[in-house]
């Protein structure tokens, strides 16, 4: 139950409403998990299409099914979604006169539970499918792949024209609700919570203690099933609970990993990363200590430092900037893998031929 204590903030009973930062963080948690899993599935499907291709083709449906099991598990046992429970929050039934005595371990009532599942699982699935449909219709419109019916053509063009405004109104609805929540004018940061008949609150000490002792109490009170149907029902419940528990454990570890990657690659953190991974300053190049009388360098700028003759097919080394004959420097670099003057590691691909007007 480390997730209960990781983000727990001490608060009085009268001030159990979470801050805007907590609710926005838990909203963005599952939003970050979906594309991460989608990328993993894409890599697997590209590496082995025969075995993992179906995961990519049916990713939305598989993810929705797993999300359904996960959210139902948490809502019925912790009165919160996975992300809300991760940040130490719970869902409180609106209008419940005994909400102060109701513990999170009791779970949500059936009505609020299925409403919450609908808005947590079904609505995001429909939104993803709608966005894919809009993208597909835009491609058809762009490449003039129109269906034969002109009435259908006018309909989907009107749909494409109206979709950005509908989407803007939808996002604006959520933005206004968040602003009202920040100003203390609303008890919900999301209108979907109000439609589900719940509001968010922080887990209390009693909630955390009840959640920690619930598995032990359930195992002690469990009675052996008598009939075959009861045994099958019990086995199915255990299987679903095991899948949900495995998903929650894997997601908890994955979330910490995602947050670490987000911190590591954030633009604000680049200077810190550079200071942590900075290597000691290397010594100055050897060729800077050479004077004009160095025996390694010819006195005339048109002479090759290797053959001491006028250069033919001028070729510069990208690693040092010195110019040689192509034949001389090619054989030297291929044999020694270094610059003849500075000793810098050099490969054949670092040779750059020069084409001057004199040639």
Swiss-Prot record:
Cytoplasmic side: 48-51, 140-144, 278-359
Pathway(s) annotated for this protein in UniProt: Protein modification; protein ubiquitination
Domain of life: Eukaryota
Single GO MF descriptor: ubiquitin-protein transferase activity
Membrane topology category: Multi-pass membrane protein
Pfam families according to UniProt: Pex2_Pex12
Binding, Zn(2+): 304, 307, 325, 328
GO BP annotation list: cellular response to reactive oxygen species; peroxisome organization; proteasome-mediated ubiquitin-dependent protein catabolic process; protein import into peroxisome matrix; protein import into peroxisome matrix, receptor recycling; protein import into peroxisome matrix, substrate release; protein monoubiquitination; protein polyubiquitination
GO cellular component, one term: cytosol
Cell location: Peroxisome membrane
Peroxisomal matrix side: 1-19, 77-109, 184-249
TM regions (residue ranges): 20-47, 52-76, 110-139, 145-183, 250-277
Signal peptide: none
Keywords carried by this UniProt record: Disease variant, Membrane, Metal-binding, Peroxisome, Peroxisome biogenesis disorder, Protein transport, Transmembrane, Transmembrane helix, Transport, Ubl conjugation pathway, Zellweger syndrome, Zinc, Zinc-finger
Keyword Protein transport carried by entry: yes
First and last residues of each zinc finger (RING-type): 304-343
Similarity comment: family membership: Belongs to the pex2/pex10/pex12 family.
Subunit structure: Component of the PEX2-PEX10-PEX12 retrotranslocation channel, composed of PEX2, PEX10 and PEX12. Interacts with PEX19 via its cytoplasmic domain.
Illness association: Peroxisome biogenesis disorder complementation group 3: A peroxisomal disorder arising from a failure of protein import into the peroxisomal membrane or matrix. The peroxisome biogenesis disorders (PBD group) are genetically heterogeneous with at least 14 distinct genetic groups as concluded from complementation studies. Include disorders are: Zellweger syndrome (ZWS), neonatal adrenoleukodystrophy (NALD), infantile Refsum disease (IRD), and classical rhizomelic chondrodysplasia punctata (RCDP).
Name by which UniProt lists this protein: Peroxisome assembly protein 12
Record organism: Homo sapiens (Human)
Lineage, top ranks: Eukaryota, Metazoa, Chordata, Craniata, Vertebrata
